[in-house]
A protein has these predicted regions:
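Short, low-complexity N-terminal intrinsically disordered segments enriched in polar/charged residues
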Residues: 1-29, 33
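A beta-strand edge to alpha-helix "cap/lid" segment located at domain peripheries
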Residues: 2-7, 38, 52-122
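Phosphate-binding glycine-rich loops and adjacent basic patches that engage nucleotide phosphates
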Residues: 11-20, 44-45, 61-65
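Conserved beta-to-alpha transition
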Residues: 40-42
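Short beta-edge strand/loop motif at the mouth of beta-sheet-based domains
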Residues: 44-53
Length: 122
């Protein structure tokens, strides 16, 4: 736990630690039962079962390390910028920048997450 951040922000930092550790059960517990997750290239994932399916079967990343470079807290929301370095399921190595936006429910669980990647698109 980091004393510089709120419990919600520490929960976001825990999220990246759990993802990097491959702790899918721990990841899912951070989300509200009806949470929605949106990221480029996929239809939104709604609910814990859909999130678990994504992390177990659909996520193109095999493993890696997230480094959070900045974290900004708002009212019931947390924004993060960071870098990811890892390996895709194909064996390809990747290194990219990302931004995540988490909406936090009154109970502390994530009600929504939106992910964006810094990649040439236009």
């Amino acid at each position: 736990m980091n004393d510089r951040h709120s419990p919600a922000a520490n929960r976001v930092l825990d999220y990246y630690r759990l993802v990097d550790a491959g702790d899918i059960a721990g990841i899912i517990e951070l989300f509200a039962p009806d949470a929605e997750y949106s990221r480029p290239g996929y239809d939104p994932f709604v609910g814990r079962a859909a999130l678990e399916t994504f992390y177990r079967n659909q996520r193109t990343i095999r493993g890696g390390k997230h480094t959070v470079r900045s974290l900004v807290e708002g009212v019931d929301a947390i924004a993060v910028q960071g870098e990811f370095t890892g390996t895709l399921r194909t064996g390809e190595r990747v290194s990219l920048r990302f931004a995540d936006f988490f909406d936090v429910a009154p109970d502390g669980n994530f009600s929504r997450r939106n992910t964006y990647f810094y990649q040439p698109m236009v």
